[in-house]
Amino acid sequence: MKRIVVVAAMLALSAGAVVADQNQVKQTQAQMKETGKNAGAIAAMIKGEKPYDQAAVDAALVKFEDTAKKLPTLFPDSSKGLKPDGDYSPAPKVWEDKAGFEQHIASYAKAVADTKGKVKDLDTLKAEMPPLFKQCGGCHETYRLKKG
């Protein structure tokens, strides 16, 4: 009887860990989708598809800053190998090259800090955003996989 209780407790703990890991994956996906949505809004302004909107730019930069702060915690070792829903998943390199990944995060955070406060109009938006977007793309090329 004691053995059954121990096994049942171990299974319950394992199931709880899997649920916690899946919740972490969902939080990561939500953070990245929101960041992407804001990047898309800025890109539309740069391309002339939407009018310049300083409030939207400021809100996007706040979101980018929030993402930069959270990124170091969004990919814990416990989430390695999980297959999230959606079009993208983290590449194994996130965990295999942790130092390189952390360097990309630091570069992104620096690009956000360098950009924040400098964008005042469409011209400064066009000048300041490409280096920041380059940081996003560089990390995605190395540490993100497209499914399918």
What are the functions of these language-model segments?
Residues 16-20:
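Sec/Tat signal peptide C-region and signal peptidase I cleavage site
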Residues 2-8:
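Sec-dependent signal peptide recognition
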Residues 11-12:
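Repetitive helical segments and hydrophobic/amphipathic motifs
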Residues 21-148:
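Sequence context surrounding c-type heme c attachment/ligation sites in exported
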